[in-house]
Amino acid sequence: MFRRSTLVLGTALALSTAAAYSHHSFAMFDNTKESTIEGEVKDFQWTNPHIWIQVNVKGSDGKVQEYSIEGGSPNGLKRQGWTKKSINAGDKISLKMHPLKDGSPGGSFMSALVNGKTLGRNVAEEYPAAPAAK
């Protein structure tokens, strides 16, 4: 009986280790830098394992560039008060992020001001004039 229990436990541990290692790294983001973009939400994807926000940003030359922003898990964000309707296509957004190291248009979500509501970490410090999200 002991041998069988040990075999079952060993198999379970081996399988759970593979799942833990399958989660990707955030090494592609430069966590020493912060940048802010302003634009219009093209798409908001409330999906596991991470949410994605596509934002169209108009440059000084008038050309629109699409940014892809990776956020936290829907489960974690729901505990912070988010819903799948917190951000919608067409919303005006000011978004703070850690940019991609390679300079591509994208980053890791930090916080945002969306239609007068704040979302994310340390929003009181980053957007002091904005009301807290409900």
List the predicted regions and their residue ranges.
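Bacterial N-terminal signal peptides
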Residues: V8-A18
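Bacterial N-terminal signal peptides that target proteins for export
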Residues: M1-V8
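OB-fold/S1-family single-stranded nucleic acid-binding modules
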Residues: L100-V123
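Short nucleic-acid-contacting surface segments enriched for D/E, G, S/T with interspersed K/R
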Residues: R79-S94
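Short boundary/loop segments of OB/S1/cold-shock single-stranded nucleic-acid-binding domains
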Residues: Y21-S35
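Short aromatic-glycine-enriched beta-strand elements
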Residues: T47-V57
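Extended, charge-rich, solvent-exposed interface segments
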Residues: L119-K134
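Conserved hydrophobic positions within beta-strands
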Residues: I37-V41
